[in-house]
Curated annotation (Swiss-Prot):
<protein>
    <recommendedName>
        <fullName>Phospholipase A2</fullName>
        <ecNumber>3.1.1.4</ecNumber>
    </recommendedName>
</protein>
<feature type="binding site">
    <location>
        <position position="74"/>
    </location>
    <ligand>
        <name>Ca(2+)</name>
    </ligand>
</feature>
<feature type="disulfide bond">
    <location>
        <begin position="54"/>
        <end position="70"/>
    </location>
</feature>
<keyword id="KW-0479">Metal-binding</keyword>
<dbReference type="InterPro" id="IPR033113">
    <property type="entry name" value="PLipase_A2_His_AS"/>
</dbReference>
<dbReference type="InterPro" id="IPR036444">
    <property type="entry name" value="PLipase_A2_dom_sf"/>
</dbReference>
<dbReference type="GO" id="GO:0005543">
    <property type="term" value="F:phospholipid binding"/>
</dbReference>
<keyword id="KW-0964">Secreted</keyword>
<keyword id="KW-0800">Toxin</keyword>
<keyword id="KW-0732">Signal</keyword>
<feature type="disulfide bond">
    <location>
        <begin position="69"/>
        <end position="125"/>
    </location>
</feature>
<feature type="binding site">
    <location>
        <position position="53"/>
    </location>
    <ligand>
        <name>Ca(2+)</name>
    </ligand>
</feature>
<feature type="disulfide bond">
    <location>
        <begin position="104"/>
        <end position="116"/>
    </location>
</feature>
<feature type="binding site">
    <location>
        <position position="57"/>
    </location>
    <ligand>
        <name>Ca(2+)</name>
    </ligand>
</feature>
<feature type="glycosylation site" description="N-linked (GlcNAc...) asparagine">
    <location>
        <position position="39"/>
    </location>
</feature>
<feature type="glycosylation site" description="N-linked (GlcNAc...) asparagine">
    <location>
        <position position="107"/>
    </location>
</feature>
<dbReference type="InterPro" id="IPR016090">
    <property type="entry name" value="PLipase_A2_dom"/>
</dbReference>
Length: 140
């Protein structure tokens, strides 16, 4: 793995570790970060702290289309926890990246399939949405 990707992963994990009142736990964001890199040239770390929903927590009104992608992803993870009774941060799934196209592979549980699709749809949304530099660290 590229050292820059490891740095991004560490920064995202550190920023998300304070997202709950329980003791911080290792979070599985490796796959999501790699999915983002599959179809986006912007470094994954650029998304953490963007708008009101990208990164740790999320509240208020999304500032733009990209921030809405993060809000939808947050809600998707929430649904994984409540409806599918799984922890999306600990769920490892199978996927493929080929020529910028993401495909969730044959995952043997509903939880894995659901979380994979949360991440795939968010990565695709990130790739399509404009990134407005002034919205980084700018929740209005």
């Amino acid at each position: 793995m590229n050292p820059a990707h490891l740095l991004v992963l560490a920064a995202v994990c550190i920023s998300l570790s304070g997202a709950s009142s329980i003791a911080p736990q290792p979070l599985n964001l490796i796959q999501f970060g790699n999915m983002i890199q599959c179809n986006n040239t912007r470094p994954s770390l650029d998304f953490s702290g963007y708008g009101c929903y990208c990164g740790r927590g999320g509240s208020g009104t999304p500032v733009d289309e990209l921030d809405r992608c993060c809000q939808v992803h947050d809600n998707c993870y929430g649904e994984a926890e409540t409806v599918h009774e799984c922890d999306p941060y600990w769920t490892f799934y199978s996927y493929e990246c080929s020529e910028g196209k993401l495909t969730c592979k044959d995952n043997n549980t509903k939880c894995k399939e659901f979380v994979c699709n949360c991440d795939r749809e968010a990565a695709n949304c990130f790739a399509k949405a404009p990134y407005i530099d002034s919205n980084y660290k700018n929740c209005k």
